[in-house]
Curated annotation (Swiss-Prot):
GO terms classed as biological process: lignin catabolic process
UniProt-recorded name of the protein: Laccase-6
PANTHER family hit by this protein: LACCASE-6, MULTI-COPPER OXIDASE
Binding residues for Cu cation 2: 84, 127, 545
S-S pairs: none
């Protein structure tokens, strides 16, 4: 049986190790310009891609393997690659964020990323970490258990990688450059995608047969590795007629959680088991945006119901089965914060012997506001309207700016921080106020943000850190997916309203089995409390994974000092490290 109204065009992209027993996984990424058809517009557009594909190749390894990726930049842009969620213990130079751990790879140059995936299993991903290039430069990084091990859940019949993305009909890098120059936010994406394809909800000839397809067999169980690679959008994810059991988030195992809807913010991953137990036929897999912002924005034009689709097709149905049109799931409303909060707060960690547990004592406490504010045009914004304020993002009223002469990690290693960054990122906001009051929306003098600067928070090696991430209503309330490089953290509490560091007492904390993540969606008009141990020397960015916010300063960097032994000391840079 087949869904006769469409042509099967989807195939999972995968890279595998060169030999069955290899402990080194080695690949070459050729970064170059690729011409692809526009969506609901005639003609093609030029984008940057890896190995001629969007999404790029899937990298597969086992826990304990070493990954070696040779990146050759034949594009017209500077590029770096970030291995999202990889700890990079002993290899901080391979983390990838431009001007934090390395200078970019210039056009015509190359750089080799070498790192081990030790103590990690599950679904991670890789993406460009310079400008909006990650709109098309991204792919999956799957880390399976060692051969002697196995999953802490029933072995699935097959695994399916599901990469969620956004698509612009113009060059995303050029759009970001124009946005910075003018001080006007870049336009919304022209479409959402599943494995690079828009699906059948965009009713125009240009999308005919551009839909991903996942074939399943009845009564088999599948592991869906779901990755939100979108630049700016959180998604609701459903498959009509099917339910899920979530077993991992951000490559950390969870207690099994049954649900019919998955909520996934930019940067996050979810592993979910799906039983193919519906009547044989064709079913829509669908994503729709979770638009958390208050005031609630209008839906972007051209989004045809704000939903993109793929097909789940039963391949072992009888010939008499009605192929018909696929069933479409009922999606939550775009501003359904209740459903989002229900999902996020229902996940807990699966406790396993020998694995990390939440720290019970705290050395460093921080209350950090995350949100938007206003400032004046910067000198580099050559087309900015200097008679009106521009939007900047900030943490504790500090809008982050990347250095432009040397990477922060090089400055740390060579002890030349002066003129590159300062060690005065504040532990508290400059003024305490009613952070989430709707009365602040868009008209408070507290929204004034100073000029962007490069400030870090220095942490002693092995210090335990507790951060309260507090959303603010200045300019607008919105859920911010905050991603920490170099570490996982435990989400010990989250809620709505204000948390001044005392409001959520220890009695409200989950100090038994809190979910472990590398990216937390701070609730709209609320807060999240995270804990981690600073046991990884280096420069580690923490930033909003909404790229339109990161680009205007919603970021900071932790400078983690070296420990007492050679194995806990910042290593020297590799000989081929790119230079600015």
């Amino acid at each position: 049986m087949s869904c006769s109204w469409m042509i099967p065009v989807f195939a999972i992209l995968a890279f595998v190790a060169s030999a069955a027993q290899a402990d080194v996984v080695e690949h070459t990424f050729n970064v170059a310009t690729l011409s692809l058809p526009r969506i609901c517009q005639p003609g093609n557009t030029s984008v940057t891609a890896v190995n001629g594909r969007v999404p790029g190749p899937q990298v597969e390894a086992r826990e304990g393997d070493t990954v070696v990726i040779h990146v050759i930049n034949d594009s017209p842009y500077n590029v770096t690659v970030h291995w999202h969620g990889v700890f990079q213990r002993g290899t901080p130079w391979a983390d990838g964020p431009a001007m934090v751990t390395q200078c970019p790879i210039r056009p015509g140059h190359r750089y080799t990323y070498r790192f081990a995936v030790a103590g990690q299993e599950g679904t991670l991903w890789w993406h460009a970490h310079s400008s909006y290039m990650r709109a098309t430069v991204y792919g999956a990084l799957v880390i399976r258990p060692r051969r002697a091990g196995g999953y802490p859940f029933p072995t699935p019949y097959e695994e399916k990688t599901v990469l969620l993305g956004e698509w612009w009909n113009g060059d995303p890098v050029a759009l970001e450059s124009q946005s910075f120059s003018t001080g006007i936010p870049a336009p919304n994406a022209d479409a959402y995608t599943i494995n690079g394809m828009p699906g059948d909800s965009y009713l125009c000839p240009e999308t005919t047969n551009r839909i991903a397809k996942f074939e399943v067999r009845r009564d088999k169980t599948y592991l869906l590795r779901i990755i939100n690679a979108a630049l700016n959008t959180a998604f609701f994810f459903k498959v009509a007629g099917h339910t899920f059991t979530v077993v991992a988030a951000d490559a950390s195992y969870t207690e099994p959680y049954a649900t019919d809807v998955i909520v996934i913010a930019p940067g996050q991953t979810v592993d979910a088991l799906m039983a193919a137990d519906a009547s044989p036929g064709c079913y829509h897999m669908a994503i729709s945006s979770y638009q958390s912002a208050i005031p609630f924005p209008p839906r972007p034009a051209g989004f045809n119901g704000n939903t993109s689709t793929a097909i789940v097709e039963y391949v072992d149905a009888t010939a008499t089965t009605d192929a018909g049109s696929p069933v479409l799931p009922v999606m939550p409303k775009p501003n359904d914060t209740y459903t989002a909060n229900q999902f996020y707060t229902s996940l807990t960690a699966l406790i396993r012997p020998g694995r990390r547990t939440v720290p019970l004592t705290v050395d460093t406490r921080m209350l950090v506001t995350v949100g938007l504010g206003f400032s004046s045009c910067q000198p580099e914004q050559t087309q900015c309207n200097r008679s009106a304020p521009v939007v900047l993002a900030n943490m504790n009223n500090v809008s982050f700016a990347l250095p432009n002469t040397v990477s922060m990690l090089e400055a740390l290693y060579r002890n030349t921080a002066d003129g590159v960054y300062t060690r005065d990122f504040p532990d508290q906001p400059p003024v305490a106020f009613d952070y989430t009051s709707r009365g602040l929306l868009g008209n408070s003098p507290l929204a004034s943000t100073g000029s962007p600067s490069t400030k870090v928070k220095t942490l002693r090696y092995n210090a335990t850190v507790e951060m309260v991430l507090q959303n603010t209503a200045l300019v607008g309330l919105e859920s911010h997916p905050m991603h920490l490089h170099g570490f996982n953290f435990f989400v010990v509490a989250q809620g709505f309203g204000n948390n001044d560091g005392e409001a959520a007492g220890a009695g409200e904390f989950n100090l038994v089995n809190p979910q472990e993540r590398n990216t937390v969606a701070v609730p709209t008009g609320g807060w999240a409390v995270i804990r981690f141990v600073a046991d990884n020397p280096g420069m580690w960015a923490m930033h909003c994974h909404i790229d339109s916010h990161f680009a205007i300063g919603l970021a900071m960097v932790f400078e983690v000092e070296s420990g007492p032994t050679p194995g806990t000391t910042l290593p020297p840079p590799p000989p081929d490290l790119p230079q600015c």
